[in-house]
């Protein structure tokens, strides 16, 4: 991933003449990383693309108000996280399915980027059964090895709540895998 000079980007964002080009750089640098963060929650390429597009639209609309109190990626991730949750809530309301049906429909579908063995596939199936927020916490902690404090900053939840959520997710995943063996 290419690096950007955040101070330079902040200056250019404030100038209407250079705002569009600065935003294009932000999109180019962070879109792939955001895609995979969103994909952890969506578990579907098309939905991930929709949420990613909504994330950048919302970021563009709020760009001139971004003051740099957090890193650009943290700001974008927070938007993406909220957009993901909104999307999942709307999808659940539109389809009006109960939780058991949702779990069945959310089963992991291997895509072209996934070529793991049976254990990895079982893990991904188990992860896909978790509620969206819990799945995101688990993925950031387990797959990305993020510290609880960093996850807390990204999702706006206390460290204690994150630890509890992660612990419950691990229990659910363990039980899921044991039931399939």
Please give the residue ranges for each predicted region:
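Sigma70-family region 2
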Residues: 40-43, 54-71, 90-92
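DNA-recognition helix of helix-turn-helix
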Residues: 85, 134, 153-180
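A short pre-motif secondary-structure segment
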Residues: 137-141
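N-terminal module of bacterial RNA polymerase sigma factors
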Residues: 1-32, 150, 179
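Short, charged helix-capping/linker segments at alpha-helix termini
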Residues: 14-25, 35-54, 159, 180-181
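Internal acidic/polar
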Residues: 2-7, 86, 93-120
């Amino acid at each position: 991933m290419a690096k950007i000079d955040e101070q330079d980007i902040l200056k250019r964002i404030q100038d209407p003449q250079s705002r569009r080009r600065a935003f294009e750089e932000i999109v180019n640098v962070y879109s792939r990383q955001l895609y995979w963060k969103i994909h952890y929650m969506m578990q579907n390429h098309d939905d991930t693309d929709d949420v990613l597009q909504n994330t950048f639209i919302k970021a563009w609309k709020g760009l001139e108000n971004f003051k740099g109190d957090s890193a650009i990626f943290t700001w974008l991730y927070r938007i993406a996280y909220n957009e993901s949750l909104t999307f999942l809530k709307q999808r659940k309301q539109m389809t009006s399915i109960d939780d058991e049906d949702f779990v069945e429909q959310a089963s992991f579908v291997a895509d072209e980027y996934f070529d793991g063995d049976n254990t990895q596939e079982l893990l991904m199936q188990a992860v896909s059964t978790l509620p969206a927020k819990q799945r995101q916490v688990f993925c950031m902690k387990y797959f990305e090895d993020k510290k609880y404090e960093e996850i807390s900053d990204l999702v706006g939840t206390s460290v204690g709540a994150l630890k509890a959520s992660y612990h419950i997710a691990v229990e659910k995943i363990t039980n899921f895998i044991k039931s399939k063996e």
